[in-house]
Amino acid sequence: MRLHLAGIIPIANMKTDHENPLPEVPVDNGFSAIQKSVYECAMAGCSTIWIVANDDLIPLVRKTVGEWAYDPVYYARNYSKFYKEHRKEVPIYYVPIHPKDRDRRDSYGWSVIHGIHSAWRTSYRLSQWIVPQKYYISFPMGLFDVGQVREYRKEIKDKEKNFFFTHENKTVKDDLPLSFTMTGEDFKLCRRHINKKTSKEYLPPLP
């Protein structure tokens, strides 16, 4: 069965050095931070992309990135006669933070956990056969050459091993906003860890 890699882009509770509350900081000409993350997830081979944001920001973010993206790997295969027919669309879903969690579960890490749980829960309600087996987390403010993501696409989608981008031998574990992958079991462990740092006792059911 084909791996369902779900891309998670946390925006809620994101802290930046800029006054702009949206991840619209330009990283290139006509290319914003949120667009970078969407492109990165598509390049990594994600089957779906889930953007976690507060209700008031979702309409603005949706206007910027839309409802779907193309998988860049399949977008322009010029060696194929009918390459346009083989283009793959990656649906984008928007996940609001529950009002009860605001100002209580207010860490950036919780936005990631909430996005993963929402992706699992929504998929499971449709069919257990489309539940994500792995998650790719992309931080809008984590800047690097996203073109190199394609080189590691196979490793990123490995069912058995997690993948971490590094900078000077440091990863997200060192509080750097660098992309990484995790499984459902990793999700459970991280959720318990983050829960210890928050005031709210309620936990959503385990996937």
Task: Report residues per predicted region.
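Conserved beta-loop-beta/alpha segment of the NTase-like Rossmann-fold superfamily
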Residues: Y79-T198
